[in-house]
Amino acid sequence: MHRSESSYCREETTLCQGVNSTWVPPADTVPEVSLIPSSPPAPDSPAPSPKPGYGFSTCEEKHGDPRIRRPMNAFMVWAKDERKRLAQQNPDLHNAVLSKMLGQSWKNLTSVEKRPFVEEAERLRVQHLQDHPNYKYRPRRKKQAKKLKRMDPSPLLRNEGFTRGQPMVNLSHFRNLHPLGGSGELESYGLPTPEMSPLDVLEPSEPAFFPPHMREDTDPVPFRTYQHGMDFSQEKTMREISLPYSSSPSHMGSFLRTPTPSAFYYKAHGGSPVCTPLGQLSPPPEAPALDAMDHLNQAELWGDFDRNEFDQYLNMSRTQRPGYSFPMSKLGAPRTIPCEENSLISALSDASTAMYYTPCITG
């Protein structure tokens, strides 16, 4: 017999009246005292099952149900008794070894020997289908604790060995690093020689030779000015420099008449070009000089250029020792050129020289 909802409310109001007050059950719930002794409950009567209204839901009953096993196949039917027999004969063998032995023995059986077990497995499948018509196979999910237990030891060991030496660097430190080209920390160390400097094209084992009249100290023109003045002829100049040359004086003279990029880099406003010694780096470009040369155009640069400056390169070629090659020989390996190619190269060199001198003559 279950109590109604109103009886619970009366009990709560009675308990809240005071501590010293005694609880008196309501009249409808007072059991009647009978002189006749009540008979004990029968032992076979089942205990009353709780109803869902008192905290027991259908979900809890569903979880409490035993898991429905899948029907056994023919191998499982055969191995059920065979495993017991092997375990009794070999009590020291591990279960994995027994499974391997059972699998090998099942493969060695013929189809006639397997037939009774196959028929028994089919009978079990039909019986299972009748007992559980709505059965749907749901594989058990692996517990995450076991997976984490297998994965945890290696990182812990690595962390313990790493923290003894030095603290671990946060990965965000490498993401926040700026590119090497854009960092301002390298500016305080000074920049090396520019890209087209004559010192860059020399081999480390080759000594440099400079005439005495070329060792005067003057300020070099910034490298950006060289790029501004030589953009129109960069492609043709590099194509001519990459061509191999012969040892004939006529071809060497025509080749040296063409202004080299390094010559224009070191001096663009007249005067002799300057080459620093090998052990000394050229200073980095200065910002004030760079801003002052931005407004100059191509005609002004070539108008102030000294035409007789290239004689110094011819003098250097005459005083150069025979054992040393031209500094630009690093770009193209020296080889002998046939006679029919000498005239073509000389004509191309003269045409490029005329193109260089045209702004100087007309301006």
From Swiss-Prot:
InterPro entries per record: HMG_box_dom, HMG_box_dom_sf, Sox7/17/18_central, Sox_C, SRY-related_HMG-box_TF-like
Span of the annotated motif 9aaTAD: 308-316
Tissue and organ expression note: Expressed in the adult spleen, lung, heart and kidney, and at a lower level in the adult testis, liver and brain.
Record field: compositional bias (Basic residues): 135-149
Domain annotation Sox C-terminal: ranges: 236-362
Portion annotated as DNA-binding: 68-136
PANTHER family named among the record's database cross-references: SOX TRANSCRIPTION FACTOR, TRANSCRIPTION FACTOR SOX-18
Domain remark text: Binds target DNA via the HMG box domain. The 9aaTAD motif is a transactivation domain present in a large number of yeast and animal transcription factors.
Protein name, as recorded: Transcription factor Sox-18A
UniProt source species: Xenopus laevis
Lineage, uppermost ranks: Eukaryota, Metazoa, Chordata, Craniata, Vertebrata
